[in-house]
Amino acid sequence: MKEAYLKHCKERKENNLPPLSLDAKQTKSVVDNLISGSDDEFFLDLLTHRIPPGVDEAAYVKAGFLTSVAKGDQFCQSISQKHATFLLGTMLGGYSINSLIDLLDIDETAETACKALSHNILIYEAHQSVLEKSTHNDYA
C-alpha cells in the first residue's frame, strides 16, 4: 500500500496536484498496518491527514478503528486511547459523534471527548444524548 500511495503522490505532484484522499479500501490498509505496527509514523500521518472528515466510507472505517482504540477494545502501539479520542474529534461530526458521547463515560477519555465535542458544531440531534448524560456526568 505504501509504495502505491507514494507512486500516486509522485504522479499527482508532477501534474501540480495534491494527492487524492484515501478511499475505504486504502483506509482499511492503513488501519491494518497501524495494528501490525508497520511504519507507524507514515501510516499515522495518513490516518490523521489523508482521510476526509464527514460521512463517506473511508471516514466510517477511520471512526470505527479510532473508536475501538479509544474504548480499549483494540490495541495500537502508536495511538493511545486519549489520542484516538482526539483524532475522533478532528473528524468534525458524522460517524465520530456517538463515539465521542460514549467516551464521556470512560475515565481515560472523558476529558478529551468533552473537549472534542465542545469544538464540534455538527452534532445535530445527538445534543439530546449529551444533555441527558449531563445529569450524571460532569464532562457532558
What are these language model-derived features?
Residues 39-53, 60-62, 78:
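An N-terminal, globular interaction/scaffold subdomain
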Residues 40, 74-78, 94, 106-111, ...:
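Alpha-helix N-cap/helix-start positions at coil->helix boundaries
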Residues 42-43, 80-85, 113-117, 140:
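Conserved hydrophobic register position within alpha-solenoid helical repeats
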Residues 47-51, 89, 118:
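Structural signature of alpha-helical solenoid repeat scaffolds
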Residues 24-31, 53-72, 91-104, 122-134:
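Amphipathic alpha-helical scaffolding segments comprising HEAT/armadillo-like alpha-solenoid repeats
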Residues 17-21, 38-39, 55, 73-77:
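Charged, low-complexity interaction regions
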Residues 2-31, 36:
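Amphipathic alpha-helical packing elements
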Residues 2-5, 115-140:
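Eukaryotic acidic, Ser/Thr-rich intrinsically disordered low-complexity regions
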